[in-house]
Amino acid sequence: MSQQTTIRKLAELVNTPVDKLLVQLAEAGMKFSGPDQVVTSTEKMKLLGFLRRTHGKAETSAEAASEAAKKITLNRRKLQEVTVNAGRTKTTVNVEVRQKRTYVKSENEGSGRAAPMTPDEERADILRKLEESRQRNLEEQQRLAESDRVRDEAIQRKREEEQAAKDRAEAERKAAEEAAAAASAPAPVADAPTPSAAAPAARSPSSPSSAPRAARPAGASPASRPAAPARADDRSNAAKHKTRGSHVMVAGVEDDDATKRFAGQLHLSAADRARRSNVRGKPTGRPGSSSSRRGNDNGRGGSQANSGPHGFERPTAPVVREVAIGETITVADLAQKLALKGGDVVKALFKMGVMATITQSIDHDTAALVTEELGHKAVRADNADFEDALLAHAEDAQGEATSRPPVVTIMGHVDHGKTSLLDYIRRTKIASGEAGGITQHIGAYHVETGRGVISFLDTPGHAAFTSMRARGAKITDIVVLVVAADDGVMPQTKEAVAHAKAAGVPLIVAVNKIDKTGADPLRVKNELLAENVVAEEFGGDTQFIEVSAKVGTGVDTLLDAISLQAEVLELKAVAEGRASGTVIESSLDKGRGPVATVLVQQGALKRGDYLVCGIQYGRVRALFDETGHQPASAGPSIPVQVLGLSGVPEAGDDFVVVDDERLAKDVAQQRETKRRESRLVASATNRMEDILAQMGKGEGQQVLNLVIKADVQGSVEALKQSLVALSNEDIRINVIHSGVGGITESDANSAAASKATIIGFNVRADASARKIVESNGIDLRYFSIIYDVIDQVKQVASGLLGVEIREEIIGIAQVRDVFRSSKFGAVAGCMVIEGVVKRSKPIRVLRDSVVVFEGELESLRRFKENVDEVRNGTECGIGVKAYNDVKAGDQIECFERIEVARTL
């Protein structure tokens, strides 16, 4: 620093404002008038000394040395390990404790001495004062430890008293139980040894030795009891040598209990630790002592091993669950019952070869297999509670069984006169009411004749109504097989015989149309012999009646035969009580709602009864017979129409009358759930089969979507079966929706979404449906005869198939020799040996009957003239385009491609 340093420059060097520096110089006794005055070195040192005195620092090195002589610093460092609880495990942490203590000699002590002390004397004086301070700390620590010991002893005495009282109460309870057991036990024999006197004394609650023995904890021997006071003395002795503010022992003795207790609180002083110990009231935790945390039964700090039933024990064996599975169950529900994740169940199904999603339903067998695969037990769930109640209602129809009318089903081939025969019997014109003169419904009628009441079921004879005929044979008592004498046995005749035999129903053969020329009843009998239908005149048990439905010949004889057969069968039923029976036909009437034609088989069906019919239920609002009248009730073997159901039931469903609507609703809902689950399982299976089929067949198969609506349920079934049967490997008929009733807006929307054709069988579309049909260009067709439906669908399906390209060989030429031409290259000299070779048609070159080239002709000549065709037995020259490897002996095959319309 230069001697000519100004105050401003000095302020910049020491990083101090100029005004502040001027003030400090003035306080140091140096007056300056401005910042531009020069500061000498002497003035700088004087300012520095002033500032050091102000901040308590020595001005010179000598003063600093004397200042350092007045100060002594003691540094201590200790390493120890602290155990920290981290959840269920314990972690050991290394902790280093550093202590620094500085002693400064006061000014008063230095000024009171006459002469300065030597360094040894100063050190001795410092050590003496430290010892005095340590003694004061030890006395304070000893006082705190003594108060802690007194408090612990009081707590220990209180716990021992509580434990003794508890043991005495337990001993009294055991003594009372033993006394009660001894009183209830049989008297001992005379020579039994008497109990010792020590036993009653041990059981007595007043025994002086019982309380200490009971109070002694398990596993603690008498020899270990005196160890507790000894450890307490050790702790009190160690506390005498402990320094205030530190847990480290001065005399080399450590307080283990305090170290463990305050292991995580090293920052606390001894006074704070003593105060917290008093507030907590913890036991000392000495091993082997009754006040130990591990041995304390009432303390909160008990170990996990002694926690009793509140501790969690890890299961050592897998849990095997018993899973109740119904007919179907979703994968998610099965996973929930198995206490597994849905993905685990899906993986198990994949391993078994079943491709299913978590929301998909699987059947009982598949669910049971995957349950067993996962190590659990599958049992079948009992879901038949409502069904059992319904069965009990059906069996509750008690009463006397009386004779009932027979149920007769008229069966036979189409146009053999079944409805005309029934028409003559009823004296009505039923046949004229059917479209096309053929029966397309099951007609149920009961006729009162001179021989009693007879219920007739008229079934259709067309091949499409197989299910109707089977249903009619199932619920009938007698089958009348109508066979035309001029036609003989036809396919549906054989089918009707098979249905009757399968149902175990007696058969009566009515040979119709005997008034026609060419009628041959004997031929009918001989043809039926091949179907194991043997006439009585041939030694069999089947009645053959020759009738004419047109003129009425033999009708009375037929009725007599029916009555005779009914008497042989001895048909009986309970005429009173709850009704039960079968649905023959069902439909949806726009004015009346769902209408079901039922045949009562037991009991009496009355208006107001609650009815369960398949998945439908309801209260009978009205009953109608075939003439339109409303009877009060319908007994056994009487067909009636029922109004009031919740929906259109399936033909062939059974119905039962129940007491209340609640049971009817529960049964219907349970059946609907089962049917829906079964349908989901079937649809899932069909989807997988369709995927695999499409993978195998590629995209070549065409699909024709249909929406079918009919007037009755039986017609819907017949249409679905007949149309789906038209499917083949090239086209598939897919019925996306079917139902009973008129064509609604919902049906039209379904057809528009799937680009389907709507078929209305004896039904029409309403205004809203027609509007959607017109706006979307949907193909809507109305029919009244099932023949026309099948023919039209065949035509539409054939149009989807398109045309098939076929190849037809029109001529073959034999190569005799090969010539070379500069214009055409190799020219084959040929002889046409078959058909005609045309210039405009494609050709193939065959060598040893193997095709070696396919192309077209470039030239066809006859005597150097170009010709269009060469016929059989004529020589010609053929130039093959883009092929020069023609050899003698080859054959040139000429063919043409033609388009052929494909049909079903």
UniProtKB/Swiss-Prot annotation:
Sequence ranges of Basic and acidic residues compositional bias: 137-177
Keywords, sorted A to Z: Cytoplasm, GTP-binding, Initiation factor, Nucleotide-binding, Protein biosynthesis
InterPro entries per UniProt: DNA-bd_dom_put_sf (IPR009061), EF-G-like_DII (IPR053905), EFTu-like_2 (IPR004161), IF2_assoc_dom_bac (IPR013575), IF2_II (IPR044145), IF2_N (IPR006847), P-loop_NTPase (IPR027417), Small_GTP-bd (IPR005225)
Spans annotated as Disordered: 103-122, 137-252, 267-315
Chain intervals for the UniProt region annotation (G1): 412-419
Amino-acid positions noted as binding GTP in the UniProt annotation, renumbered to this chain: 412-419, 458-462, 512-515
Keyword Nucleotide-binding listed: yes
Region annotation G5: where it falls in the sequence: 548-550
Gene3D superfamilies: P-loop containing nucleotide triphosphate hydrolases, Putative DNA-binding domain, N-terminal subdomain of bacterial translation initiation factor IF2, Translation factors, Translation initiation factor IF- 2, domain 3
MF term (GO), any: GTP binding
Residue stretches of biased makeup (Low complexity): 178-230, 280-293
SUPFAM superfamilies (UniProt xref): Initiation factor IF2/eIF5b, domain 3 (SSF52156), P-loop containing nucleoside triphosphate hydrolases (SSF52540), Putative DNA-binding domain (SSF46955), Translation proteins (SSF50447)
Region of interest (G2), ranges: 437-441
Region (G4): 512-515
Location of this chain's protein in the cell: Cytoplasm
Residue segments, region G3: 458-461
Statement: the UniProt record of this protein carries the keyword Disulfide bond: no
Similarity comment text for this entry: Belongs to the TRAFAC class translation factor GTPase superfamily. Classic translation factor GTPase family. IF-2 subfamily.
PANTHER family assigned to the protein according to its UniProt record, in alphabetical order: TR-TYPE G DOMAIN-CONTAINING PROTEIN, TRANSLATION INITIATION FACTOR IF-2-RELATED
Official protein name in the record: Translation initiation factor IF-2
